[in-house]
Amino acid sequence: MSKHTRVTSSETAINQHRSLNVEGFKVVSARLRSAEYETFSYQARLLGLSDSMAIRVAVRRIGGFLEIDAHTREKMEAILQSIGILSSNVSMLLSAYAEDPRSDLEAVRDERIAFGEAFAALDGLLRSILSVSRRRIDGCSLLKGAL
């Protein structure tokens, strides 16, 4: 192909199709009105997604697949970091108490309470993330709401 030869969009699509591993995937097509497509595509681009990825995210959400947003991920990481710190604190306090039973037992109790609260927060967050039936209901509600 010379450098002045123009590649058509269908050739580009064929070349992309050849380079992708499509094994295990099903191709789904949908007819959209021009305004629907333009709005959808614009929204996908704002999020940095291709049209295909945006459709896949929507399908996964409706199907109840696990998707964790950045805020939830940050919250989980903060809780896990807190649990790690609290665990170290409790361990150090218990070691100090074992060496000298006159050490501050109240500090051990306070750290233990905070540790339990952090675990409860993590448990609640994980339950909301992992609740398959709730995710499917949420996704189906989105779909029904769109109809």
Curated annotation (Swiss-Prot):
Range of residues in the leader sequence: none
Enzyme class of the recorded protein, top EC level: hydrolase
Keywords for this protein: Crown gall tumor, Endonuclease, Hydrolase, Nuclease, Plasmid
One MF term in the entry's GO annotations: endonuclease activity
EC number(s) stated in the UniProt entry for this protein: 3.1.-.-
Transmembrane spans: none
InterPro entries assigned to the protein according to its UniProt record, in alphabetical order: VirD1
Function field: Tumor formation by A.tumefaciens involves the transfer and integration of a defined segment (T-DNA) of Ti plasmid DNA into the plant nuclear genome. The virD operon encodes a site-specific endonuclease that cleaves at a unique site within both 24 bp direct repeats flanking the T-DNA.
Name of the protein in question: T-DNA border endonuclease VirD1
Gene that encodes it: virD1
